Regions:
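Conserved NB-ARC/NACHT P-loop NTPase core of NLR-like innate immune receptors
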Residues: 1-206
Length: 206
């Protein structure tokens, strides 16, 4: 069923970094990955224009050559991506065209932290993008109360999973990241043990 969907919603936000890491590790060379994290403390700044502009910037940064239509758009706006130089409709149009030529994963974390009015615009924009971009897939995370909004705005193309990570999974992820630390002496054994004990217990109970 999920294979037929273009949007995957996880109503647990605790493993979003695991999903993004897996996508980055396993993605083919011609696959683009762009991510955005909503933060409650930055709600006013994280408008639909800024959010989608950030995704566009990431996708464009991964291209070997910037398409002419994007160059011309920014010559006209003379502003940075996600800024006031481009309107939301223009950014959506640029994403439609750019994503239509390559396989892309858009990862949007903590959608529930987005202002409700902004969230509806974001979802409507994403649906518009998906209509024109057959090879684009969207990974969303958010608390359960936004599920209705998402399934309504992205009706027929959303699969929802509720996932609760196990302590062992979280411990393994933390252990792997600590082992990759390029400066292991910066953390003493007591702090490391505390991290490996408390974080898995706390997250698995959320």
């Amino acid at each position: 069923m999920i294979k037929k969907r273009k949007v995957l919603l996880l109503t647990s936000r605790n493993i979003s970094s695991l999903v993004v890491d897996t996508l980055c590790d396993q993605a083919e060379q011609d696959t683009a990955i762009a991510c955005f994290y909503f933060d409650y403390a930055s709600q006013k700044e994280q408008s639909p224009t800024n959010m989608l502009g950030s995704l566009l910037k990431q996708v464009v940064a991964g291209l070997e050559e910037i398409p002419e239509h994007i160059v011309q758009a920014f010559k006209g706006g003379k502003r940075f991506l996600g800024g006031r130089g481009l309107q939301l409709s223009q950014i959506v149009e640029l994403l439609e065209v750019t994503l239509s030529s390559q396989r892309t994963f858009l990862c949007i974390d903590a959608l529930d932290e987005c202002i409700a009015a902004h969230r509806l615009k974001v979802l409507s924009s994403l649906r518009q993008i998906l209509r024109k971009s057959a090879d684009t897939r969207i990974f969303l995370t958010g608390r359960a109360h936004v599920r209705g909004e998402i399934e309504s705005r992205l009706a027929g193309i959303t699969a929802t999973l509720f996932i609760t990570p196990r302590k062992d999974d979280i411990y393994g992820y933390l252990r792997a990241r600590l082992d990759e630390d390029t400066n292991p002496d910066a953390m003493d054994d007591c702090l490391e043990a505390d991290i490996l004990k408390k974080i898995p217990e706390t997250v698995s109970e959320m």
